[in-house]
Amino acid sequence: MAATFSLIGTIEPFLHCNLKKGDSIYCEANAMVMMESNLELKGKLQGGLMQSLMRRFANDESLFQQQIEAVNGEGDCLLAPTLDGDMQIIDVGAQQYTLSDGAFVAAQTGVDIRANIQRNLGGAVFGDTGGFMVMQTQGQGQVVVSGFGSLFEIDVTPDKDVIIDNGHVVCWDSNLDYKLSVSTSKKKGIMSNIINSVTSGEGMVLNFSGTGKVIICSRNRDSYQGWLQSILGTSSGGRGGNSGFLNNIL
């Protein structure tokens, strides 16, 4: 029997994991908040060295992920993502998902998070979707994702394409097609689209089509970082400069 996941709390919840003896889960580095003494935590190159390096390149994740195993008997642990925000437990198997940068929190051992070559060149060059690599789920079980702020699930249907600001996308159904552009305008000229993007205040957007769902978050991490920099300043001169501080927390 696989370990079970549940969320505790309504605002910035904990991820509660219950493991029977012999069960294990894996999670992003530093996600563990608390665990009972029957559990054992160790760093592991999940999927081997090559996949670990590819995940590092794709999503700037830690090379070693945490593996928590119930070695001495049943036990519970609490996990939390790095940034403020909500989490969602997703069932994978019949449906697989593509994850944006920093979205992965934890997964059952039946699920593999693999770095694959991105099929969308525009997203590879300009998007927050992992550069030329994207993180995709494989296998069967549950994976937990997080986003900055509250999460909301959007259904995409063949008769209803959806345009989403790139910085608000957490994950999406891998069956969906997506295109990245610099504007929500339907004009075809690249300069007019760039001008519209600048004047409207919108940056990159993703246009999803097909059938599937997209999970979005209410806050944009990059915009928030820019706002903090405007308040605190970006000077990096001297020890403890604000730029270094911001880089450490974001």
Predicted segments, located by residue:
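Composition-driven recognition of glycine/serine/threonine/acidic- and proline-rich low-complexity segments
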Residues: 1-250
